[in-house]
């Protein structure tokens, strides 16, 4: 096993280089910005490549020494990816709302985890039938609520040794708690974020779905590398196992935008985007686009293809930037 390899081409294809609108930047990120195009900051991937390698090495080294990695990503486009990467690498995750004190008040969190385990036992035991329908429903709701917040860390058994974070602005409480306890943080830091206090900073787009998938896949594979090294250092012969460890390689399919069959709840007013009329909004809807967050997740090439289909190809980058702003304002 070895650290996962990646290329600058992969980063470009995933849209890692796209930052936020230039007027929404954090000046502390100036040294990591290559320039601006259409009022969108472009991240210097020549710096991202070695910094990402350093972060992956830190992850692998932490796990090789027996440490635990906690994946943190609670924004909508990161939730499923973060959970999948953590599960695939036998680590831990928080992908719902971060509960204040998750790290700094671990004793209380442990009590809640104990309650979650107890509810699991109650609902899965043969005695579950002794409860009334209303009692079972109440217990199930309590169990589901706890599982959303704590399900990814219920088997952690103690504080993590390293945090991997998507979006340092959104996860600022988690980062502050880690800093108070001296837990190192590896994080994807966009152009609107403050890099202060991040142990292993990786300048990159923290909004695009493809970029988030790439980061999480690389970190998961770095964890697997660390686990393999730990087994080798202990003299354990993984090759002698009846069922040897396997690294699950992700199936990389050609990126293809998939619209929604209909809006999720109330559709957003897409006419708030510059140059979007009622007719163009209808074209967006025909393509399955009803919400700003859908546009905010688009990579560069897909955004241009969609803007061509609605008749305004020159607006692609501006629409994505505006959609990000409007999504964050929700």
Curated annotation (Swiss-Prot):
Belongs to the universal ribosomal protein uS2 family. This is Small ribosomal subunit protein uS2. One of its GO terms (cellular component) is cytosolic small ribosomal subunit. It comes from Rhodopseudomonas palustris (strain BisA53). PANTHER family: 30S RIBOSOMAL PROTEIN S2 PROKARYOTIC AND ORGANELLAR, SMALL RIBOSOMAL SUBUNIT PROTEIN US2M. HAMAP family: Ribosomal_uS2_B. GO terms for biological process: translation. It comes from the Bacteria. It holds the Pfam family Ribosomal_S2. InterPro entries: Ribosomal_uS2, Ribosomal_uS2_bac/mit/plastid, Ribosomal_uS2_CS, Ribosomal_uS2_flav_dom_sf. NCBIfam families: PRK12311.1 (NF008966), rpsB_bact (TIGR01011). Disulfide bonds: none annotated. One of its GO terms (molecular function) is structural constituent of ribosome. Keywords: Ribonucleoprotein, Ribosomal protein. PROSITE patterns: RIBOSOMAL_S2_1, RIBOSOMAL_S2_2.
